[in-house]
C-alpha cells in the first residue's frame, strides 16, 4: 500500500525541498523518537530507514556542498531515535521488565526515566546538528559530554 501511494516519494520530496539541509538529520532523529515512542519498539528503525536514506540522498543531490558525512549522520539519527523511544515508551518490553524487576508500576518507571531521556535527546539534537555541519566525532562527543556535565552541575541535586 505504501509503495502504491508513493509515501516514500512524498516524504522525500517534502523534506528534501522544504527543510534546510543542516536540520534534516535532526528532523529524522525527532521523527524517529516520536515513532519509536508511540510504537514502543526498535521496529521504527525498519519503518523510518527506507525513508531516511532516500531523503539523505535527495538532500545531498540538491545541495552539492554537503560532505560525505551527511548520510551516516542521517542513519545515526534513525538508530538513536529508535533507541530513545524504546527506552522511554511504557509499552516496550525493556520498560516492562525493568519495572517488574524493580517492583514498581510500569508507568511510574517510565515517568521517572523520561526526564533523563528527554534531556539526553535534546543534547543529542545539538550534537547531531554539530555532526551535520562537519565537526569531527571527537568534537561532537566532547560537546555532548560538556553540555550534559553543565546540566548536571546546574540542575543536579546531591542525594
Roles of regions detected by a PLM:
Residues 37-45, 131-140:
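Interfacial segments of transmembrane alpha-helices in multi-pass membrane proteins
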Residues 14, 18-22, 91, 112-117:
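Loop-to-transmembrane-helix entry motif
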Residues 73-114:
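Alpha-helical membrane segments and immediately flanking helix-loop junctions
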Residues 1, 28-36, 53-55, 78-82, ...:
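Hydrophobic core segments of alpha-helical transmembrane domains in multi-pass membrane transport
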Residues 19-59, 63, 71, 78, ...:
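Hydrophobic alpha-helical transmembrane segments of multi-pass integral membrane proteins
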Residues 69-73, 136-144:
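Loop-to-transmembrane alpha-helix initiation sites
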Residues 3-17:
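Membrane-interface helix termini and inter-helical loops of multi-pass transporters
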Residues 17, 52-62, 95-108:
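Helix-loop-helix connectors at the membrane interface of multi-pass transporters/channels
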Amino acid at each position: 500500500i505504501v509503495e502504491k501511494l508513493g509515501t516514500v516519494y512524498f516524504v522525500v520530496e517534502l523534506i528534501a525541498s522544504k527543510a534546510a539541509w543542516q536540520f534534516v538529520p535532526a528532523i529524522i532523529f525527532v521523527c524517529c523518537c516520536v515513532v519509536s515512542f508511540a510504537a514502543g519498539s526498535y521496529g521504527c528503525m525498519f519503518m523510518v530507514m527506507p525513508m531516511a536514506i532516500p531523503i539523505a540522498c535527495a538532500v545531498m543531490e540538491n545541495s552539492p556542498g554537503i560532505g560525505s558525512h551527511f548520510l551516516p549522520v542521517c542513519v545515526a539519527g534513525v538508530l538513536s531515535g529508535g533507541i530513545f523511544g524504546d527506552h522511554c515508551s511504557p509499552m516496550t518490553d525493556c520498560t516492562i521488565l525493568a519495572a517488574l524487576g524493580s517492583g514498581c508500576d510500569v508507568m511510574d518507571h517510565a515517568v521517572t526515566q523520561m526526564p533523563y531521556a528527554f534531556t539526553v535527546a535534546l543534547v543529542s539534537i545539538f550534537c547531531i546538528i554539530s555532526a551535520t555541519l562537519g565537526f569531527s566525532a571527537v568534537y561532537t562527543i566532547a560537546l555532548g559530554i560538556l553540555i550534559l556535565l553543565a546540566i548536571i552541575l546546574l540542575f543536579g541535586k546531591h542525594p
